Amino acid sequence: MSCTFTALLRLGLTLSLWIPVLTGSLPKPILRVQPDSVVSRRTKVTFLCEETIGANEYRLYKDGKLYKTVTKNKQKPENKAEFSFSNVDLSNAGQYRCSYSTQYKSSGYSDLLELVVTGHYWTPSLLAQASPVVTSGGYVTLQCESWHNDHKFILTVEGPQKLSWTQDSQYNYSTRKYHALFSVGPVTPNQRWICRCYSYDRNRPYVWSPPSESVELLVSGNLQKPTIKAEPGSVITSKRAMTIWCQGNLDAEVYFLHNEKSQKTQSTQTLQEPGNKGKFFIPSVTLQHAGQYRCYCYGSAGWSQPSDTLELVVTGIYEYYEPRLSVLPSPVVTAGGNMTLHCASDFPYDKFILTKEDKKFGNSLDTEHISSSGQYRALFIIGPTTPTHTGAFRCYGYYKNAPQLWSVPSALQQILISGLSKKPSLLTHQGHILDPGMTLTLQCFSDINYDRFALHKVGGADIMQHSSQQTDTGFSVANFTLGYVSSSTGGQYRCYGAHNLSSEWSASSEPLDILITGQLPLTPSLSVQPNHTVHSGETVSLLCWSMDSVDTFILSKEGSAQQPLRLKSKSHDQQSQAEFSMSAVTSHLSGTYRCYGAQDSSFYLLSSASAPVELTVSGPIETSTPPPTMSMPLGGLHMYLKALIGVSVAFILFLFIFIFILLRRRHRGKFRKDVQKEKDLQLSSGAEEPITRKGELQKRPNPAAATQEESLYASVEDMQTEDGVELNSWTPPEEDPQGETYAQVKPSRLRKAGHVSPSVMSREQLNTEYEQAEEGQGANNQAAESGESQDVTYAQLCSRTLRQGAAASPLSQAGEAPEEPSVYATLAAARPEAVPKDMEQ
């Protein structure tokens, strides 16, 4: 009984499963499409019909009609079927359903699936009516418009929700376009809002136009705002490449760049992996890129706040209307002073703007029209100036309705703010006056270790800058090569020094004038009074004159490093002239002079040079007295001091050597005189036999005495050669009882006779003997007297005869020691010729 019940229960359950099939109640399938239900033409589309029973056959219906059938293989039962279309066309657009069947029954239809094929008609455009930027929870109005007379517009939002809105088109008579407005919102910050629009005909609702460009709504969230910057700068020339960087949080996935004047997102940068920097590269900047930019970033945490505003200016728009920039009174201004930058143009700009390098923007001013010149200008007054104003300035013109579109820039204007640090020196090695075609190099140097120097021509707009070089002497130097000179080279120059780490420049150097000759059609004349050759201390006048009208005359000395002299001309006898007077002249003013003429209207442009005039100043150089009318520049003064020190050192060294030699010579002369005196004493004490007055040698029983006598002669001759003193020995009268030997020594300087008498012989006896000698040589005495007036220094040592007394004293005959003979030396002021002839024997 129980078994029968169980069998009946199983049969009932089995029948319950078959009853829906038999009665047509199979579950309806599910129809899907890949990749999307809205596809463009020539896209591969696959329909998937899925069920749960295990059907034998699947059928695809389009617009209510059987479109395609797929029979399943019983060996490989599956619960789905694929219907593929490799290249869909407009004919494939429509409504699709699917169904399936088993061996016994067919299922019902799936839900309706619409396949839209795009790419027909005109492409519409989509814009945010005000801005794509919207706050969280807010609404934004998007406008879709097209030239084609479509009946409908549809707006779609990408994302899992597949939001869409449909509106009837309306004709806009002002734009002659068809359009529709869509209000999108509320916008939430937890997703991206990428919108597109299409147009279609109501009679063909599944054939759409191509999609518009996407507009992504930028939601202002709560995350930290990113930073934005432009490279190479926010002021960019048209057609140049540039990059805008946006840097945000580390988890940022997408960066957005928005031009605030644009009704759509400017650019989107999707990162391959989360990062904190987005790069927006613009290969060629155009007018459309000008404007104010902000950037946003989006990540897993949502949207960030907007960045600060970056104003991008495109220049070079008005290519042929370049403004002009100048500075008054000079591009070099002392710190604390004022300057005026003058921007002008012939083109009627509404505004001028002044910019400085390394700065975002400068000041802008409305233009004013100058009716007399027809120009439009603006005056930018800056002051009091500080070192921060040093740099390069430009000005641009623009219109009020396009403030980010500027003209081509003016020429660069350098501004230099000079301070109080030590001024450098400026010189030229080619001279102050140059002929056209000569090369000119100006040298700026200082004992301060400046890193760079600047050269400025007074009245000019340019400032040249060069890095300095260090010399072995500790100077910093920079050479400015101006090339071949012309009339434009003439002027006054100054230079300045600065350190790399400071924007402040030094005080100005002394001015240096550069004058160019041959610029006036005249040649002046130059004369000198009283003579071309004058004595030191006299007054000299150089007269420069011309028959042509000349405002100023310039006097130049050849080879001088000094600035040329200038004098206003005076009219005299229908000629222009100027007299350059120099009092108390010294030999420093000797040289060749030329003069030139100049007009006040062209101060640094000279006439041709006059004929050269040679001035010679005789007399000693008064080194303690500087030139009365010319001053030496710093460079020449350094050279002069070095030369003076060198000469002084050499002179002192020579003086020391001379004193040393003189002292050594005196010491040697004294030593020789002592030796000679000692030998004379030895000779007089050791001789036993006298020598006759006539020079006949008598018997010499003592050989040592003879040897000493020969030594004495040799010593006297040696003294003659070394000391330069003349020794004139002569024999006294025979009646001299003492038999003493006399030696006459002539001094080096001629004097009158009768200066020194011997210590033994009386002055009267010596004068008597000298008078007897003079009687035989009267002519020689006259020659001697005539030589007394000559200031000639000489010394001649002449050995004549050495006489020794022959007679022995009574004491010697008695055996007593003989008395030593005496050698007398007397100074006489007579020449050698004044000695009596009988004494020379």
Swiss-Prot record:
Q: Which residues form a coiled coil?
A: none
Indicate how the chain sits in the lipid bilayer: Single-pass type I membrane protein
Intervals, Cytoplasmic compartment:
664-841
For the modification Phosphotyrosine, the affected residues are: 794, 824
Q: Which GO terms describe its cellular component?
A: plasma membrane
Q: Where is this motif: ITIM motif 3?
A: 822-827
Q: Where is the signal peptide?
A: 1-24
> Which segment of this protein is annotated as the motif ITIM motif 1?
711-716
Q: Where is the composition biased (Basic and acidic residues)?
A: 690-699
Q: What is its main location?
A: membrane
Q: Where is the composition biased (Polar residues)?
A: 759-770, 778-802
Keyword line: Adaptive immunity, Cell membrane, Disulfide bond, Glycoprotein, Immunity, Immunoglobulin domain, Membrane, Phosphoprotein, Repeat, Signal, Transmembrane, Transmembrane helix
Can you state the subunit structure given in the record? Part of a complex consisting of SKAP2, FYB1 and PIRB. Interacts with PTPN6/SHP-1 and PTPN11/SHP-2, when phosphorylated by LYN at Tyr-794 and Tyr-824.
Q: What is known of its domains?
A: Contains 3 copies of a cytoplasmic motif that is referred to as the immunoreceptor tyrosine-based inhibitor motif (ITIM). This motif is involved in modulation of cellular responses. The phosphorylated ITIM motif can bind the SH2 domain of several SH2-containing phosphatases, including PTPN6/SHP-1, resulting in the dephosphorylation of the downstream protein kinases SYK and BTK.
Look up the further comments and give them: Belongs to the leukocyte receptor cluster (LRC) present on chromosome 7.
Protein name, entry field: Paired immunoglobulin-like receptor B
Q: Which organism is it from?
A: Mus musculus (Mouse)
Name of encoding gene: Pirb
